[in-house]
Amino acid sequence: MYKLQVVLVPPSLQATMPIQFGYGPTIAESSQLLPNRTNMAQSAGDASLQYANLRSANVSFTPSYFNQSRFRKFLLFTKPTNTLLNLSDEIIDKCEKMYPSLQEDIEILSLQDNSGCDLDPDFLVKDVFNVNNIVRVILKNEIDLDDSAPVSLYKSVKRSKLNNGSPQSVQPQQQIPSSSGVLRIAKKRPPTGTTTTTTIRSATNGSMRVSTPLARQIYPPPSSKIVSNNSDDEDEDIGERSFLPPPTQPQSPPIRISSGIDAGKKIKSSIVEEDIVSRSATVDPDKTKQQRLLSGTPIMSTMTPNRVTLTGQRVVSEHAHKNELVFSASASSSSFANGGTAAVTAQDINRKPPVTTPRITSGMLKIPEPRISEIEKELKEGPSSPASILPAKAAKIPMKKPYLENGENYESDDSSSSENQETPETEPHSKASLQRSQSSIADNNGSPVKNSPLGDAMPHNVHLAELPKASNTSITKSSNGESWGKQQEHQPPRKSSLETIVEKKSQAEPSGIVEPKRMTNFLDDNQVREKEDTNDKLLEKEILPTIPHNDQPILASSDKSNGTLKSLAGKVSSNNNASKEDGTIINGTIEDDGNDNDEVDTTVRIVPQDSDSSSFPKSDLFKMIEGDDTDLPQWFKGKNSRTSGNSKNSKPYTTVLNKDIDNSKPDPRNILPQRTPRSAAKRAAQLLAGAKKNEVPQKSTEDSSSAASTDDESESGIETDFSSDDDFKRKNMSVPNNGPKDISLHSLKGSVVPVKDSKIINKEVDEERNDKRDSQKKSAVSESSVTNSKISEQMAKSFYPNSNKKQNEATKVETKPATQASSFPVVGGSPSVATKGTTSFNEEGNRKNVKTKAKNESAQIDRQQKETTSRVADLKSANIGGEDLNKKAEGSKEPEKASANIQDANDKNNSKEKEDSKSKQVSQKKLKMTDHLKEGNVQLPKPSANDKLKDLKAKFTNSKTLVPPGIISNEKNNSSANDDDSSSSGSSTEDESSSSSSSSDEETSTSRKARRVVVNTPREPVRSSSKIEAPSPSVNKKINATPDKIPVTQLMDMSSPPSVKSKTTSNPSSILHDLPRKVRPSLSSLSDLVSRGIPDVKEKTSKSNEKSQTKAPSSSDDESSSDSDSNSSSDSVSDSSSDSKSESDSDDSGDSSDDGKSFISAKSASAALGKKKKPSGGFASLIKDFKKK
């Protein structure tokens, strides 16, 4: 079959050629509509395409409206074998059918092709219209077509539908038989039943259309019978033009009517669908559109806006036609909810065209409104109703409820344990307070917060606090106080962040050495506590495995957080640490635990321990140190008031835990930290600790002993810890997993810790403990002045009160000269360690010591002159601290002189041997010293240290005088023979063995840094001593400065550690022997430092006086007053302290420092060089004081 475009050309249009092309647009339309069919029908596709292109081009040129009234155009399907004569007959018949309004039958003069050629009637259609399907029919008569008249009976049917059965020629429409499917503009005339089918359709459609103008859109079903989509489009356009705009929107009354129609249709399908159809108003516009569009999806969308819940289901029901409607209503409703509507609509689309037509034709407009209401009820109740969907949502809500219940259940388990731990009285408080606090604490668990309003949920809330505990469990050690371990778990996250920071800093800057020394400083109190705190120690020992690695960072961080606690708490904490460390903890990790436990443990440590009584004396001691004696009852009371008032305010758990948790019941807060976010858990643990402290002053006293480091805070000792703990919490909230809980109170320890291997630190701490205990036993005053001066001085500048600061400074001044004096006599043996070899170490040390003494004698005048100059600069930089230190040093000179006298004999013996070697170096060193003195005034103290080696008491008898008898005897042992240098190097070798690797690295870095600093000094003799010494004071400074970030701490590291080192250097082994082994580990670093420091000091004193002068000028250029002062005044100190510290670094480094004991470890040297500049002010003041002395 060929599809031909028949164009009726009346005589008026025959003369004009453009009409051809004017037909072009219609042709183009038809060809465009069915280009494929045209090409397939015609053999010459190329030509047809070309013509089509021309036509399409012409289409734009010739307006279709110009030809509309003049000619008619329609499609005609004919057999390719028909002749043109037969074609003409078919055209006449088609015209009669298509245009019944024609007044006269058309008479065909000729048939032409698109190019206007007349065609022979004998031609076959396939021959002529293979390329072009346009047939121009030249008419004899004008075509009188009424524009209002419908083009075809199907057009009249439309009118009847639209006009409720009364055809009105309102809209011109181009209609071609559905068979042709070509759009034609036809003059509309009142529909006359030209065809029975037309009348029939109009009747049926009219009956249905009467229901609503929206229904006219249903006409597509009849048009759907017609194959052509264009007719449908025209119908839509026409309907929309005239009637559609109002009818589509009017939904209420027409919807009712149409709903009746639709309902009737659906009723046909099934009565059950009435539920789906229930709202015909919704259905009707959708149905009309759906029937037009034949697409279920748009229908669904239209349905939904009218009735959101019902429409989807209804639409589905409509789509799910008749038989399926019953189950499809429910299934479709569920499918809508499930998004299965697409599938339903697809089925509906497939079914729809046929089904909708029967529906329309059926014209079932019979759905009583009561049925609709019933359907609505059914929709509410039925499976298709939204209620069917709601159950799933309801299921979700129950899901949440069981989830809350589940959380409550596991919480209830925790709460049962917590309740068992908590007294019933505290439980109601904990419930109320936990409800308040758990808004934050229960962050991790929404259910606990929900439970919190419930009275029973409160134990659950406590369990919520447990949630963070799981993350913190690494620190939890089953100990006598489980809650204490749990609290530590809470605290370790706080500390973990601080520890991480401190560890990073300590790693970057070796700063952990002094803190363990601090820990060991107060061995006597710790020993007393050790007896009393045996239970606590046991618990702490259990906890220790997790804590030890955190010791250094904890100390450093705690020093930062609590400055005041550091000095006094450093002393007390060293005692506590000694007891706890002796108990099993290294470097006061237990003290950190104790300190943290002071707050947390007071709460957590429910088991009343004998240490409580000891904690009172310790707290009294701390308060006496702090001058806060009145605060001690407040401290116990203050644990409740402070922790509840200060830390509790910041910590939601504090108030709740204090109220809720009895000391007997630490578990609830332990539970709280487990489940609460770590910050909340930390707060809860801290607050609980505060609450238990409040509840149990004895425990607070116990913890106060462990927290003795916080006694400087005595009122706020724990409180400061809490404040620091709050900071720790805030800091550690991000890092809850770093186990140790010691961080909060360990701020006291933090300043001194240099970055060293834990082994080194432990050794130092052990040795320091041994040395310090011996020294304390021999002279508690001198020991406290030495170690306390270290710790308290370090803490003093930043934290401890002026009284403590002055005491610490006085102690420092005394201990520094004592250290220097003691270290100088011993220095003979070990100074060459820094230089190169252990074998030549003692010889060079003796030689250098002799030279140094000679040089010191000759250089003393220059040094004294430069000292005055450097003192002037020092006075500028540190007049305040320096004057106090000078006064205190002078005050301490007399006691130091007694010890110095003892040392003098030893030093004289050593100095005699060393003077020979020194005399050789004196000339060289004098030259170097002169250059160095010229370079920097700061280094006078180093010559004064050499003078100490010479005179051993000339200027710095103060430092010698203060040496405690234990240290003096140790110094005697060390200074008795240069062999002690080797023996000290041997004892240090023991310590060095662990830290030999670090020592070699430290030595190299120290020598490098010394080289950097020292420009003019010859490196061989000077390098061994001065390089080490100059870096070592700076190392001490850096190490101290890093943890405390306090110049005083650095000075303490330089001054007090050197004094301890020099004092203990003479006999580190003897001190270690004197001291219990427990004390030795903490003092091991000190003993190592001392053992190396004294021999190193002698060599270094002469060389370091020169080199440190050279170094000091270079470094003092950066820190002219502070660094030069710290270099010069600490040259004497650093001769001992830096030498001892370089030795301590080498001791820490161990075996390698046996090879070169005088060398400062690279870490200590780098830290010293790096830290010199940081604390320049504080160090300068202390150094100036020494210089002034």
Swiss-Prot record:
Superkingdom of this protein's organism: Eukaryota
Record's keyword terms, sorted: Cell cycle, Cell division, Mitosis, Nucleus, Phosphoprotein
Compartment annotation: Nucleus, Nucleolus
Assembly description: Component of the RENT complex which is composed of at least NET1, CDC14 and SIR2. Interacts with NSI1.
Functional note: Has a role in chromosome maintenance and is involved in mitotic exit. Inhibits the action of CDC14 by sequestering it in the nucleolus. Also binds to RNA polymerase I and stimulates rRNA synthesis. Influences RDNA chromatin by tethering SIR2 to rDNA in the nucleolus.
Positions with biased composition (Pro residues): 244-253
Compositional bias (Polar residues): 200-210, 432-450, 470-486, 641-657, 778-792, 1023-1039
UniProt PTM: Phosphorylated by CDC5.
GO cellular component, one term: nucleolus
Cross-referenced PANTHER family: NUCLEOLAR PROTEIN NET1-RELATED
Residues with Phosphoserine modification: S60, S166, S231, S252, S437, S439, S447, S452, S497, S830, S1056, S1059
GO BP annotations, alphabetical order: cell division; negative regulation of exit from mitosis; nucleolus organization; positive regulation of protein localization to nucleolus; protein localization to nucleolus; rDNA heterochromatin formation
Compositional bias ranges of the Acidic residues kind: 590-601, 710-725
Span list, region Disordered: 160-260, 345-1189
UniProt-recorded name of the protein: Nucleolar protein NET1
Modification sites for Phosphothreonine: T676, T1042
Family from the record: To yeast YKR010c.
Miscellaneous information on this protein: Present with 1590 molecules/cell in log phase SD medium.
Chief localization: nucleus
Composition bias, Low complexity: 166-180, 391-407, 682-691, 822-833, 969-999, 1055-1070, 1123-1137, 1158-1169
Organism: Saccharomyces cerevisiae (strain ATCC 204508 / S288c) (Baker's yeast)
